[in-house]
Amino acid sequence: MKKRFVSAALAAVMALSMTACGSSNSAAETTAADTEAAESQAEETTAEEAKTTDGGTLIVGFDQDFPPMGFVGDDGEYTGFDLELAQEVAKRLGLEYKAQPIAWDSKDMELESGNIDCIWNGFTMTGREDDYTWTEPYMANQQVFVVANDSDINSQADLAGKIVEVQADSSAEAALKEAPELTATFKELLTTADYNTAFMDLEQGAVDAIAMDVIVAGYQIQQRNADFKILDDSLSEEEYGVGFKKGNTELRDKVQSTLEEMAQEVSEKWFSKDVTTIGK
């Protein structure tokens, strides 16, 4: 609350000091506004942390077309390696677990609006390190190319003149943007909303290759019993982490410490071996 001190002795110089006073008042107003904004942000973060601790709810944002990390099972229920990790973490923390499917290209809006508490679905940290409050990486990953087994494509060099498809706003798309010398050789680079569609396009011959996560590629090939292969030369190396809204360190710390305790157990259930890296 600004206070004005005016006396008769200053009346004679009031006109001369008006500009300076205006500048000072403006600075004070700006400082007050900045302080209020910071306090508001702190209150929002505290509220978010409170609702996801002490018997609250853990709302996990995920792509429902990203097996084996998150997808719709044969029984119509959401399942996946990442979702089972999240569910077990919530159980151990005494939180109600809720899997919330999201459009992958809207994930930031969902997180910022508070519709979800975290993004947990094969979420690549590389290139996004400063955008979220992250757990430690819990899994290593690569971006690779998938092609038909009987195609003449055996390396990235063979992709010249070919049609390549990638999920919009994915890590594979980001990796391709970092390799303009490679993408310049493609006949066309297409984007799709999900990898199920991409695999159907590949099966039908509408595209020649898909750029995607190696863990998802291997699972898709196995489940479809399809005659596809993964090229040996990878596009990029990266790591998966759980992303929270910037500043939500309390929930991040609770999730991370719990994840370290049980990630290996869930990994062995899904992959018959421990593929996790957290706590190692």
Residue ranges and their predicted role:
Residues 18-32:
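Bacterial lipoprotein signal-peptidase II cleavage site
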Residues 64-67, 78-91, 123, 144-196, ...:
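Bilobed "Venus flytrap"/periplasmic-binding protein-like clamshell domains
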Residues 83, 98-109, 189-204, 238:
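Short helix-initiation/N-cap motifs at beta->coil->alpha
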Residues 87, 91, 96-158, 229, ...:
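Acidic, polar ligand-binding/catalytic clefts
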